[in-house]
Amino acid sequence: MTTDWAEIACEVPAEMVDSLADFLVELTGNGVGIDNLHLDTFSLDTLEDTPLKSVKGYLPLDDSLEEMRIRIEQFLAQTGPSFPGYVYAPPVVTVIRNEDWANNWKVHFKPVRIGQRLVIKPTWEEYLKLEGDLVIQIDPGMAFGTGAHPTTKMCLEALERICFDASGGKLPSPVLDVGTGSGVLSIAAALLGAKEIVAVDIDPEAVRVTMENLELNGVADLVAASTTSLEQLPGGFRVVVANILAEELVRLADELTARVAPGGWLILSGILTEKEAFVCAAFNSLELVENPKELEWSCLSFRKPL
């Protein structure tokens, strides 16, 4: 049985976009579209400087849709008046048939170079590989990252920098990927030389997509993907990467820190710059080494003392 989807579009002032987008991501667990800019599920295009934006969330077309619509209306009514230029307009719901959704979104996903050697390409696109390129093939489905979003991109760049600085030019093992999504970070870790990688996600569908992408890239023998909880995993990981929401990073701070080996790396993203200090405070036992930013997003790279 295929699932049809509902697109819920809300027209809001530009200043309200981040707040509404964060709310929709947490509410739906799926990608969010903002005019012609797509977060996480799609590639990044130029967002025109217009006073009003159409922010779009995506939900399965089922019995929960009406409840979700009401929650979005409540958020708009409660939050909107605090933003200049806000005028309430009810969300517009559009039904997207599964076969249209599954194919039409793909036009937004093109090969993208990240860092010096990593290239992410969808399975349906051709790419002429250059010498030294490490090409990650991804078929992300509809709800998991392509690698083009700034948070994923900064994590990939951090992994590549660690690789360049490491002995032998290979990423140290073992590696832990928390909230693996489509598996793109685990695949990159394997291509960068890590020989033992653990990928975990609370969503069984994310794990299924990850396992398919691991096979697609020929690294399934290097990565163990599962829904195993963080507290069930051992410590001793030389690299831990977690690209999840800031609030979750803070909630899991002790567990994440405990999984890092002495001298090891902890890479965190999914953090809005305004929440950077909030996250840093939760990891104050570690040394902050790098803090790149892109758009409104921040990435934090820590090292654990020996």
From Swiss-Prot:
A Gene Ontology molecular function term of the record: protein-lysine N-methyltransferase activity
CDD domains assigned to the protein according to its UniProt record, in alphabetical order: AdoMet_MTases (cd02440)
Primary location class: cytoplasm
Alphabetical GO biological process terms: methylation
GO CC annotation, single: cytoplasm
Subcellular location: Cytoplasm
InterPro entries listed in its UniProt record: Ribosomal_L11_MeTrfase_PrmA, Ribosomal_PrmA_MeTrfase, SAM-dependent_MTases_sf
Protein's UniProt keywords contain Transit peptide: no
Family: Belongs to the methyltransferase superfamily. PrmA family.
HAMAP family membership: Methyltr_PrmA
Name of this chain's protein: Ribosomal protein L11 methyltransferase
Organism: Citrifermentans bemidjiense (strain ATCC BAA-1014 / DSM 16622 / JCM 12645 / Bem) (Geobacter bemidjiensis)
Lineage: Bacteria, Pseudomonadati, Thermodesulfobacteriota, Desulfuromonadia, Geobacterales
